[in-house]
């Protein structure tokens, strides 16, 4: 239940327009930084902000850790993601876990599923897909993230481990 409460709070933060370094340009006091760092939302096809697909990502060096969320067929799907930045705008998602869906078949309580999928920033937006020709498909826009939510995510034990390099087999 705690996990779903955090997802709901993150969704509400996107609606409230509270501080984010993407929207405000303020790096704040966060121990993380990088172009991927922040909250990203894709709201195409929905009239309810709570149903927007989203990533909340924290970046330390080339390590990107965060959460993902999407709403489909009347159900909430959420989980965690680890990525490795190859450049300032290109990364590869290497590990994922969460509610069983098209994103993962591994619950977070059971560990991490290894994957190799893109995560890119193009035209100021985040993309987790590539077109057939390899070009970027940017549809997640940067949204404001409340600093207290950033701090809460940083305080999660799994996030502390992730930003410190655990699991260690992630590049």
Features from the language model and the residues they span:
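N-terminal, post-signal-peptide region of Sec/Tat-exported proteins
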Residues: 59-76
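Sec-dependent bacterial lipoprotein signal peptides
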Residues: 1-13
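Beta-sheet ligand-binding and adhesion/scaffold domains
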Residues: 22-28, 42-47, 51-56, 84-171
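Bacterial signal peptide processing site
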Residues: 16-19
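Phosphoinositide-binding peripheral membrane targeting modules
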Residues: 78-80
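A glycine-anchored, Pro-Gly-centered beta-turn/N-cap motif
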Residues: 34-39
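Intrinsically disordered, low-complexity regions
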Residues: 6-9, 61, 156
């Amino acid at each position: 239940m705690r996990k779903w409460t955090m997802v709901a709070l993150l969704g509400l933060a996107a609606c409230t327009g509270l501080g984010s370094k993407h929207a405000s340009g303020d790096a704040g006091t966060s121990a993380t930084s990088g172009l991927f760092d922040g909250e990203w939302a894709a709201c195409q096809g929905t009239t309810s902000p709570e149903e927007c697909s989203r990533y909340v990502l924290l970046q330390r060096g080339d390590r990107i850790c965060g959460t993902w969320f999407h709403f489909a067929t009347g159900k909430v799907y959420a989980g965690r993601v680890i990525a490795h930045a190859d450049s300032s705008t290109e990364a590869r998602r290497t590990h994922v876990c969460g509610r069983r869906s098209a994103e993962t078949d591994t619950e977070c309580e059971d560990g991490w599923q290894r994957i190799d999928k893109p995560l890119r920033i193009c035209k100021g937006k985040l993309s987790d897909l590539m077109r057939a020709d390899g070009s970027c498909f940017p549809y997640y826009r940067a949204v404001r993230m409340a600093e207290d939510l950033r701090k809460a995510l940083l305080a999660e034990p799994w996030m502390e481990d992730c930003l410190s390099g655990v699991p260690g087999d992630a590049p």
